[in-house]
Design a protein with these regions (language model features):
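Short hydrophobic/aromatic patch on the recognition helix
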Residues: 53-54, 58, 103-104, 108
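Proline-centered helix-kink/hinge sites
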Residues: 66, 115-116
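Residue-level marker of regulatory loop/turn positions in helix-turn-helix DNA-binding domains and
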Residues: 15, 19, 32, 47
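An amphipathic alpha-helical interaction segment
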Residues: 1-14, 18, 22-25, 53
Length: 126
């Protein structure tokens, strides 16, 4: 016996196109606002869907959560700013809207396996 809740609905091209558009708008919004305070709730509101819907779309299309994507974009931007060499780590943390330099440093080390200062030293020796 087949109930409606057990059926997987097939996505029509129009539905897939709409999903792609939401994900594309999300990627663009995060890129344009990398220095702002960003959260799944803020971004989902900006692209006009619920946080849970955005999370489901992101998992389906990108294989990561929107929160993880935001973290990755901010951390990649922090690497760029470190390479640029015009800001200290406190300024970079503030520029990218981290609550504290400790939070920034911890996330950086978790992602890249080295602290921001270790990264800065590694690129100076290249």
């Amino acid at each position: 016996r087949d109930t409606g809740s057990e059926k997987k609905r097939l996505k029509t091209p129009v539905a897939l196109n709409h999903e792609n558009e939401i994900v594309s708008r999300t990627l663009q919004y995060v890129a344009d606002h990398v220095c702002d305070k960003l959260s799944v709730e803020i971004v989902s509101r900006e692209v006009g869907v619920s946080a849970s819907h955005l999370t489901a779309l992101f998992h389906r299309q990108m294989n990561i959560s929107p929160g993880e994507y935001i973290r990755r974009v901010k951390l990649e931007e922090s690497k760029r700013l470190i390479r640029e060499g015009t800001m200290n780590f406190s300024q970079i943390a503030a520029q990218l809207n981290y609550s504290t330099i400790h939070h920034f440093s911890r996330q950086f080390k978790d992602k890249f396996g080295m602290s921001p200062s270790e990264y800065a030293k590694s690129i100076q020796s290249e």
